[in-house]
């Protein structure tokens, strides 16, 4: 019987894995330089964690199950809610703001397509405990810095949900949620039908459609004509000035609503070319989610980067590392093991594990593109030396182990 991997998942071969780990390390270094610390949360959580405020779209895609104790559990579909749960359980006494990041796999039962999988990896940041404009600006600027560090120049769109909610303040909360979802998906025909169905005033319909179609860097005066100079826009304008100071390139789009119901104010998304229909590589915003899980009314800002989508268009490749194969005969194999142990302090080393003859060992070294071969022969050992062959140039030298180490480490530098 052949058992294949589940639909919507992937296997990563050594070269793919090395590249992913390298890009991941670049991103980790960036966020650490901004003062963020890594956390890890469980792969599965209680179902309630995600049904409270994640939105209908995500709830319908959960990999949920009942465990042997009769508890409703689910594989995590995203990581903001688990981080908030972690904060309530463990981190409330810590000094604010808390600056956290994570890199974990998530699971959603959705139709697999280019750039979208049922198991996917998310790199994210959460800044907990500050609702100031400076915090929003830092988080957005950090997202921008991360994408630039991996060679991606994205198209950043910023909005503020307080603007749309000001327009919709006379509607029932469930209607507001429906409107926000339709706006987020840009289902304008469905939005128009919903507004007709609830008997919305013509002025509301006109203002809403005008607002969500406004785009550009300098549209705030037009936005104020629609909703007035509401307090949320004062802080938002300060955020924009700070982003200009950070050197972040952005445009405003008040049609951004995000697919998660817990965002409250500033929201942003970043799009990149080369991904087909799934162009979004990063999204986030400000939220107040902690009180849902038993904590206080703590403002937070964060974002998630779709790591799998990043990898489809990221130009980074790991720097090449030298590798070496030791060739020996049965009579010198023990010495070869000792030599390998010493050389592994300086570069990756492989020895023969298949009892191959000399010719087959050299053939294997060629097959794996080894940079060097060290021959551990009886004559070499009698002379207290080894033969180093450069597999690129073909040059061969009889050297002591110390000379080989010096030569190899010098070439690596």
From Swiss-Prot:
Gene3D superfamilies: Anticodon-binding domain (3.40.50.800), Bira Bifunctional Protein, Domain 2 (3.30.930.10). GO terms for cellular component: cytoplasm. It is an enzyme of class 6 (ligase). PROSITE patterns: AA_TRNA_LIGASE_II. Its main location: cytoplasm. Keywords: Aminoacyl-tRNA synthetase, ATP-binding, Cytoplasm, Ligase, Nucleotide-binding, Protein biosynthesis. CDD domains: HisRS-like_core (cd00773), HisRS_anticodon (cd00859). Its EC number is 6.1.1.21. It comes from the Archaea. It catalyses: tRNA(His) + L-histidine + ATP = L-histidyl-tRNA(His) + AMP + diphosphate + H(+). Coiled coil: none annotated. GO terms for biological process: histidyl-tRNA aminoacylation; L-histidine biosynthetic process. It is found in: Cytoplasm. GO terms for molecular function: ATP binding; histidine-tRNA ligase activity. Pfam families: HGTP_anticodon, tRNA-synt_His. Belongs to the class-II aminoacyl-tRNA synthetase family. This is Histidine--tRNA ligase. It comes from Methanosarcina acetivorans (strain ATCC 35395 / DSM 2834 / JCM 12185 / C2A). The lineage of its organism: Archaea, Methanobacteriati, Methanobacteriota, Stenosarchaea group, Methanomicrobia. The gene is hisS.
């Amino acid at each position: 019987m052949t058992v294949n991997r589940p639909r919507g998942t992937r296997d990563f071969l050594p070269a793919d894995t090395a590249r992913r780990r390298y890009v991941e390390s670049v991103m980790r270094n960036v966020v650490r330089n901004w003062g963020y610390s890594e956390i890890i949360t469980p792969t599965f959580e209680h179902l309630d964690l995600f049904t409270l405020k994640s939105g209908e779209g995500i709830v319908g895609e959960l990999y949920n199950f009942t465990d042997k104790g009769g508890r409703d559990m689910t594989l995590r579909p995203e990581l903001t809610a688990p981080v908030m749960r972690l904060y309530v359980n463990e981190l409330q006494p810590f000094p604010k703001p808390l600056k956290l990041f994570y890199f974990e796999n998530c699971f959603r039962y959705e139709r697999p397509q280019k750039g979208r999988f049922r198991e996917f990896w998310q790199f994210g940041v959460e800044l907990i405990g500050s609702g100031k404009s400076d915090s929003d600006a830092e988080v957005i600027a950090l997202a921008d810095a991360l994408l630039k560090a991996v060679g991606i120049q994205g198209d950043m769109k910023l909005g503020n949900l307080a603007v749309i909610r000001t327009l919709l303040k006379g509607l029932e909360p469930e209607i507001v949620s429906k409107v926000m979802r339709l706006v987020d998906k840009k289902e304008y025909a469905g939005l128009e039908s919903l507004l007709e169905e609830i008997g919305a005033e013509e002025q509301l319909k006109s203002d809403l459609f005008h607002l969500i179609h406004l785009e550009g860097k300098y549209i705030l005066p037009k936005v104020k004509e629609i909703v007035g100079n509401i307090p949320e826009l004062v802080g938002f304008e300060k955020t924009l000035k700070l982003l200009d100071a950070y050197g972040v390139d952005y445009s405003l789009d008040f049609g951004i609503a995000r697919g998660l119901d817990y965002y409250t104010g500033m929201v942003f998304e970043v799009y990149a070319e080369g991904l087909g229909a799934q162009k979004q590589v990063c999204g986030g915003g400000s939220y107040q989610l902690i009180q849902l899980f038993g904590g206080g009314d703590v403002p937070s800002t964060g974002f998630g980067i779709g790591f799998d989508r990043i990898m489809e268009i990221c130009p980074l490749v790991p720097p090449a590392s030298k590798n070496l194969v030791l060739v020996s005969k049965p009579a010198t194999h023990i010495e070869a093991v000792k030599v390998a142990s010493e050389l592994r302090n300086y570069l990756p080393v492989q020895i023969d594990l298949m009892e191959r003859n000399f010719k087959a060992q050299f053939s294997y070294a060629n097959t794996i593109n080894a940079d060097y071969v060290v021959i551990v022969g009886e004559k070499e050992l009698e002379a207290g030396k080894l033969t180093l062959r450069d597999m690129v140039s073909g040059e061969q030298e009889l050297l002591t182990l110390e000379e080989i180490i010096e030569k190899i480490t010098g070439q690596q530098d």
